[in-house]
Amino acid sequence: MECVGVQNVGAMAVLTRPRLNRWSGGELCQEKSIFLAYEQYESKCNSSSGSDSCVVDKEDFADEEDYIKAGGSQLVFVQMQQKKDMDQQSKLSDELRQISAGQTVLDLVVIGCGPAGLALAAESAKLGLNVGLVGPDLPFTNNYGVWEDEFKDLGLQACIEHVWRDTIVYLDDDEPILIGRAYGRVSRHFLHEELLKRCVEAGVLYLNSKVDRIVEATNGQSLVECEGDVVIPCRFVTVASGAASGKFLQYELGSPRVSVQTAYGVEVEVDNNPFDPSLMVFMDYRDYLRHDAQSLEAKYPTFLYAMPMSPTRVFFEETCLASKDAMPFDLLKKKLMLRLNTLGVRIKEIYEEEWSYIPVGGSLPNTEQKTLAFGAAASMVHPATGYSVVRSLSEAPKCASVLANILRQHYSKNMLTSSSIPSISTQAWNTLWPQERKRQRSFFLFGLALILQLDIEGIRSFFRAFFRVPKWMWQGFLGSSLSSADLMLFAFYMFIIAPNDMRKGLIRHLLSDPTGATLIRTYLTF
């Protein structure tokens, strides 16, 4: 699915070499790349120093949940993905004026330089706010897949590098399902340059530094303390540093533990591409395993996600939709190679490897805190699909407008005091997480908990019913456009269409799983 990077990443100890499997025959040359990539990465780590070091301190994480969000047992691969060389992308420090720490009080500091952070900083500065952006100067390294019409609506169609006229789903050996919606692959380079250009034009300031902590001053200001004893005073701070932001934010207690979507991908030149280049393969759940590999499928059901860039160049990705414990990347790679071998695909050249790690579900931020959040740090990742970039980019203007209005109304009248901050921050939080959004999220969390319990045949059965509901429903579900009332209607249709064993499972899940009680309680709250 969509790949979302984890921006605030650190390790709890010195990196250790992951266990990598090698296989005989033709699979050996395909497996070499992950080993060589790790060797090159480890060498870079050993030779680096200072803020760019690959060894980070345990204190970078607030708790075990934060560590899992950052990458947990797969952290080394998450860091390898982050450290990819993307020479085409401009450096933020070369294009944006530097923050002069201590010389002025900024209206807003945005922590984190991913798509969410850049978008919010640019939109806020466009409205006249004095905005500072703080975070390591890293490129966009993840591949993003989007529905073409959604990116067009954002005015970002020029950032799409390839479009497929339709998307296709395979569940078993029966007829495939055409979704009826064009899909695009986003150019990392074009998206980075476009968002950076917007920041430059709006006058966003920048500091290439990690943030140590955020301190609330007695005068109502926030102090952003960075490396090297640099302190930036500001009126508001928004954390957009990825899912693992517990060091700066408080999250609600009592929510289900965060789950993880992992995917291993390769862009390759191949012989015998089995897929139509005009169609993007959204999910391929067909059976491809031999008896000696069934245990892999039993523990971690996965599907193939494929983007044919040409008749011979394809991006293949083996994806575990969600798991309580992250499916290891070496197992994902093994399953991908087994699948490609079964399909008769022979890899001639590897252009790039990708390690996608997306925390899904978990807790919402505590909306009574002054420090704000945006993007994955604000739990804006869709719990059931792993998508978040379109939502972050589409909601950035609205969030920026709310912040600008708050500052105009209160600061211009010298009303922004420490005592008024909590109620003012609540206004911003309620824009990001109104009750309607919370209802939708409770529905998705209920669905996520159900998916976590299903084996491969259960997942196929679920999606057979899913794609039999009215088309506008499942298209809206995948595009995150259904209201909470629409989602209830969707659930009703699913229940009517589903086989008896799934109906029983749905009732049991609603009555016994904590997400069922949360769903009912959230829907009844107004």
UniProtKB/Swiss-Prot annotation:
Biological process annotations from GO: carotenoid biosynthetic process
GO cellular component, one term: chloroplast membrane
Main location: plastid
Root EC class: isomerase
Catalytic activity: a carotenoid psi-end group = a carotenoid epsilon-end group
The keyword Transmembrane belongs to this UniProt entry's keyword annotation: yes
NCBIfam families named among the record's database cross-references: carotene-cycl
Keyword Transmembrane attributed: yes
Pathway membership: Carotenoid biosynthesis; alpha-zeacarotene biosynthesis; Carotenoid biosynthesis; delta-carotene biosynthesis
An annotated Gene Ontology molecular function: intramolecular oxidoreductase activity
Record's keyword terms, sorted: Carotenoid biosynthesis, Chloroplast, Isomerase, Membrane, NAD, Plastid, Transit peptide, Transmembrane, Transmembrane helix
Pfam families the UniProt entry points to: Lycopene_cycl
Gene giving rise to this polypeptide: CRTL-E-1
Protein name: Lycopene epsilon cyclase, chloroplastic
Subcellular location: Plastid, Chloroplast membrane
Topological type in the membrane: Multi-pass membrane protein
Known function: Catalyzes the single cyclization reaction which converts lycopene to delta-carotene and neurosporene to alpha-zeacarotene. Required for lutein biosynthesis.
Family annotation (InterPro entries): FAD/NAD-bd_sf, Lycopene_cyclase_b/e
EC number: 5.5.1.18
